[in-house]
Amino acid sequence: MDSPELTLRERQVLGIVIQSYVVSAAPVGSRYIARNYNLGLSDATIRNVMADLEREGFISQPHTSAGRVPTDKGYRYYVDLIMHVQRINDEEKRRIDADFGQLTCERKGTSTEVLFSAAKVLGTISRQLSVVLSPAFSNAVFEKLDMVLLSSSRMMVILSIRSLFLRTIVMELDIEVSRQMVDDVVAVLNERLSGLTLVEIRRTLVVRLSDCTCDSALLDRIVRSSGELFDETPMIERLYISGAEYIIDQPEFKQPEKVRDLISMIEDKTSVAKLVDDATAAVEAVKPQGMDVSITIGKENIERKAGELTILSTPYYVGDMVGKLGILGPTRMDYEHAVRVLNYMADCLSTTLSEVP
């Protein structure tokens, strides 16, 4: 980052201002720091340090207060160079394991329900808006295809993707088909496409089926529908959100216009998904202390409506596929706790999905 190096005193005072403000949501003054923290500095000295921090843009003074609050620049310096993320403690770990295990069991343990449960638990534990994006299917490996004949002109196509995910599509047919015709086409598709990525299938499907001798009408219908069958799942259909009630309850969003903007953003699920998915691509995104968590703060976010939010994003893994797990909240956030919980939840999700039957 381009910010100047701070002295030890400045780091200490900036850290205290941020930690105090995160807890109280109230501006922090020099007298409060002198009385409550044993820095060996007088009120006047702390005031001078805070003046230097303000001059450099790390803290600012709200119009109606004598205290100071962190700026985006201050939070960024704190996240990059001051905060220390400890391992998740046993109590938090037990709570996450218990809540996640119970929800997953109650919801039958399918991949979809596991993702929903992860969003629910992450929102509850972090007290922020939680977002889970299921893995993109672009590079997913096709395993097999099944067709269920619903009528002579209607069938359901079920795609099995390696690493446990399914895609189900109902197709209306302009031809009448028999069970034997369906079985023949399924056998050919599975023989010639299994083990390929969806990208490879879309690119080479016509060539791979060009010498097929089975019923051409049904096969032609499959080829014409290949964009729908083998294409990427829309981002909005990969999104699981929970915890909106927690973020709306934050002091930052008490003003009606801010609540409206926040609700509008949350309801635009495509924007929320992109915020989490794009967080790792943001210029200022960092991964603190070797942890695979990206953090974008305030105006670093591309979306204007997220200008007062912090977005944390981390990957989780399902075989060869990668999904995203995220937390959205005000910039006044307990960053250490958020990173700690997000990392552990990503590990839980990766492990659980690898065990889904």
Curated annotation (Swiss-Prot):
GO molecular function, one term: DNA binding
Record carries keyword Ion transport: no
Disulfide bond residue pairs: none
UniProt keyword terms in alphabetical order: Repressor, Stress response, Transcription, Transcription regulation
One GO BP: negative regulation of DNA-templated transcription
Transcription is among the record's keywords: yes
Family: Belongs to the HrcA family.
Matching HAMAP family: HrcA
Function: Negative regulator of class I heat shock genes (grpE-dnaK-dnaJ and groELS operons). Prevents heat-shock induction of these operons.
Name of this chain's protein: Heat-inducible transcription repressor HrcA
Organism: Chlorobium limicola (strain DSM 245 / NBRC 103803 / 6330)
Gene that produces this protein: hrcA
